[in-house]
């Protein structure tokens, strides 16, 4: 009754009287409260959170704690927080998460369109009118004033996108999410049913042995990778499973029925007939999930349009309660999608899906998965990409940014993307400037120059920017020696500017990590070159002290700032440091295998290290990245034979392998070492095995053997691949790789 009476009174004010007679609303004067925070007796959880947030931050600013009440006796003034009436929503086209902030008769009204609109209205009030900021979890700017007032206003704001996720560690923080107007996955999706759910619904461990026909037919053979979606038993199993799971989570509306993370879709006659009719492997998927959507009309069935299933079907339209999760994983990140010739197929695909689907959930990628701490200059494409996606009907967004301390410009990118998700047409440069000035204070001019230089350098070339790319790919462009030197000069000045402010200095040092990381990785790629770790002269090798110190400095900053894993595979700074120290400990002097010839049977995959067998004896041990200094074999056994060139008294023999399960790379099952004096008759000197399921292994493993006696010329390694990914792996049963590097003989 109170709320309705107040609203009725306010509606008697004309728009002109509002403009002419309103004055600023004083809420605190000399530390004394002049208003209360008014909520409805039936306030939603969001309204209560909004009221508490406003109370907390006004106290932080002014030292005055406003009371929260459900009743105000005239003539007392108030800040009201509640859901707008239906007629107000219709008049202002107010939608879920939207809000109105208005003033009238020395009162302030924050009216929600539903959802978290009241929280976001409070955030707007704190940011725009009271000067507060939250740049990262725990990093706030709070001005201090004993008196506070709000100018007269009538401000309506709605989100351009109805669901907004920026993935990463930062958004695990609820308060940070609220300040950035973001959602969490759990707000929409059933727990355990977000993506890649085929195996959860029809686990191969349960069914494959007795019913291989439930799974993909590839090259005439049934494999575990995907489901056969034209098999009626598969459909019935999925229906039964979903009914049981939905009973456990009755409040959850969106359920993912989506392909596993591989390319092995079914090629049986029935599936191929549909694929040919639809012109896309998405055909069987959409027909399958449409049946489920009809079976569960009160739920939403989410499915992927990803990699092989990205092109839209030509015949079948998704039902209204089917969500299309469209992914951009293949695209170049240096140019806006709609302006890049290499992205034309995606531009066509999103247009095609937009013609047949009303519920598109866009999964975009704004991070380098393999080298999250390396420079990844994509700030200039974030706004045009989100503008393009939103204009093409994608209003639910998952931005996979993998935000964490130490990831390249992580705090800035999360801050900018959040605001672009709410309003894609904001002034992005102003947002960047606001962040840089608030986060870096006196160091801001130099950080801004660094950002500008990175962007201008990649715009010059328009080179491919890959979400799995290695810094070496850009060693002659934005990561050239001259550019790295310029960036370092800026960071030197930035550190000097804030040397008396330890907290700000730490932020500057963390933002310098990507430049240090790139220099280390580029140096590792050419150990004996001009940017490498060693100076070579007459077969002697001297470690450059400045490069060694660079590794130490990088690791120290990581430790001091609790830097999160350095890539998607969870590489810890300590592991990276140890692997790098191992890497730069070149195996040259006393190494009989250095630059000697190796033959392989069969040959390694040419897409890694160009299949160059000389990498196995170049004196450099591979580190954590399979794309640098490693050679790979997929799902097979192989042999490597080293020719020392002449008979020698070899005693200790070793070979190294890599472990990166997210990239489907495991250590081999076993390595057998054999030696020979003539290359014809070999004798075994040892066999080493890797036991267990390889769920947790060291990143690198050295297989060490001892030759008990006699001169040898040839060394042969017989390596048994693991071949199939183990049961614990998300792509269990898929082909696994073995990656091998440095052979050392002493």
Predicted regions: what they are:
Residues 302-330, 373-380, 406-414:
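Substrate-binding cleft/loops of secretory-pathway carbohydrate-active enzymes
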Residues 50-53, 57, 88, 92-287, ...:
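Feature activates predominantly on carbohydrate-active enzymes
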Residues 420-601:
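Catalytic domains of carbohydrate-active enzymes that cleave complex glycans
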Residues 23, 306-315, 340-352, 383-384:
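Alpha-helical scaffolding within the catalytic cores
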Residues 233-236, 244, 344-445, 449:
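Structured mid-domain segments that build the active-site/substrate or prosthetic-cofactor binding neighborhood
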Residues 1-23:
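Bacterial Sec-dependent N-terminal signal peptides
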Residues 17-100, 146-154:
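Acidic, contiguous N-terminal accessory segments
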Residues 621-686, 699-746:
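Aromatic, loop-rich ligand-recognition surfaces of beta-strand-rich domains
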């Amino acid at each position: 009754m109170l709320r309705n009476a107040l609203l009725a009174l306010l509606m008697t004010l004309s728009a002109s009287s509002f403009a002419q007679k309103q004055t600023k609303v004083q809420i605190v004067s000399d530390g004394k409260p002049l208003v209360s925070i008014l909520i409805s007796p039936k306030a939603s959880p969001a309204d209560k959170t909004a009221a508490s947030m406003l109370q907390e931050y006004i106290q932080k600013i002014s030292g005055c704690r406003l009371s929260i009440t459900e009743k105000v006796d005239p003539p007392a003034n108030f800040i009201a927080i509640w859901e707008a009436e239906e007629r107000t929503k219709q008049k202002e086209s107010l939608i879920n998460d939207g809000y109105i902030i208005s003033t009238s008769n020395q009162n302030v009204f924050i009216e929600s369109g539903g959802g978290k609109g009241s929280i976001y209205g409070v955030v707007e009030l704190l940011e725009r009118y009271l000067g507060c900021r939250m740049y990262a979890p725990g990093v706030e700017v709070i001005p201090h004033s004993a008196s506070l007032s709000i100018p007269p206003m009538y401000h309506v704001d709605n989100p351009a996108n109805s669901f907004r996720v920026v993935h990463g560690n930062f958004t695990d923080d609820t308060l940070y999410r609220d300040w950035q107007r973001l959602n969490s996955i759990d707000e929409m999706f059933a727990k355990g049913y977000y993506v890649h759910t085929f195996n959860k619904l029809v686990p191969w461990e349960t069914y494959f042995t007795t019913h291989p026909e439930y799974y993909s037919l590839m090259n005439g053979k049934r494999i575990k990778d995907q489901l056969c979606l034209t098999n009626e038993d598969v459909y019935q199993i999925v229906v039964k499973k979903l009914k049981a799971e939905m009973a456990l989570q009755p409040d959850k509306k969106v359920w993912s029925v989506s392909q596993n993370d591989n390319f092995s879709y079914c090629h049986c006659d029935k599936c191929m007939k549909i694929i040919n009719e639809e012109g896309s492997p998405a055909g069987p998927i959409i027909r399958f999930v449409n049946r489920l959507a009809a079976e569960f009309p009160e739920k939403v069935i989410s499915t992927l349009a990803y990699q092989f299933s990205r092109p839209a079907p030509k015949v079948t339209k998704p039902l209204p309660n089917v969500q299309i999760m469209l992914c951009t994983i293949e695209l170049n990140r240096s140019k806006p999608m709609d302006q890049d010739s290499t992205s034309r197929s995606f531009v066509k695909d999103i247009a095609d899906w937009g013609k047949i689907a009303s519920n598109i959930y866009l999964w975009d990628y704004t991070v380098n998965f393999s080298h999250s701490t390396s420079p990844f200059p994509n700030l200039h494409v974030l706004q045009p990409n989100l503008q393009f996606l939103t204009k093409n009907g994608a209003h639910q967004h998952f931005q996979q940014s993998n935000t964490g301390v130490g990831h390249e410009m992580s705090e800035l990118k999360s801050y900018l993307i959040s605001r672009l998700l709410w309003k894609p047409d904001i002034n992005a440069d102003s947002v960047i400037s606001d962040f840089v000035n608030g986060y870096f204070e006196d160091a801001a001019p130099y950080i801004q120059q660094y950002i500008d230089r990175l962007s201008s350098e990649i715009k010059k070339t328009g080179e491919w920017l890959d979400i799995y790319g290695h810094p070496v790919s850009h060693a002659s462009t934005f990561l050239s020696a001259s550019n790295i030197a310029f960036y370092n000069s800026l960071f030197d000045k930035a550190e000097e500017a804030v040397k008396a402010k330890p907290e700000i200095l730490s932020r500057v040092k963390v933002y310098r990590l990507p430049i240090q990381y790139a220099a280390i990785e580029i140096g590792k790629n050419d150990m004996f070159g001009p940017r490498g770790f060693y100076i070579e002269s007459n077969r002697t090798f001297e470690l450059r002290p400045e490069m060694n110190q660079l590794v130490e400095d990088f690791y120290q900053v990581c430790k001091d700032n609790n830097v999160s894993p350095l890539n998607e595979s969870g590489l810890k700074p300590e592991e990276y440091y140890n692997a790098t120290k191992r890497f730069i400990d070149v195996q040259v002097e006393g190494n009989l295998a250095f630059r000697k010839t190796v033959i392989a049977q069969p040959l390694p995959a040419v897409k890694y290290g160009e299949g160059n067998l000389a990498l196995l004896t170049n004196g450099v041990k591979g580190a954590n990245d399979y794309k640098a200094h490693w050679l790979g074999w997929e799902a097979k056994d192989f042999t490597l034979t080293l020719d020392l060139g002449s008979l020698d008294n070899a005693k200790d023999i070793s070979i190294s392998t890599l472990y990166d399960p997210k990239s489907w790379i495991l250590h081999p099952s076993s390595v057998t070492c054999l030696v020979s004096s003539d290359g014809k008759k070999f004798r075994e000197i040892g066999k080493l095995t890797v036991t267990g399921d390889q769920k947790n292994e060291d990143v690198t493993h050295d297989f060490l053997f001892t030759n008990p006696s006699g001169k040898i010329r040839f060394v042969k390694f017989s390596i048994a691949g693991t071949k199939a990914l183990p049961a614990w792996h998300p792509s269990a049963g898929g082909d696994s790789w073995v990656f091998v590097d440095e052979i050392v003989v002493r």
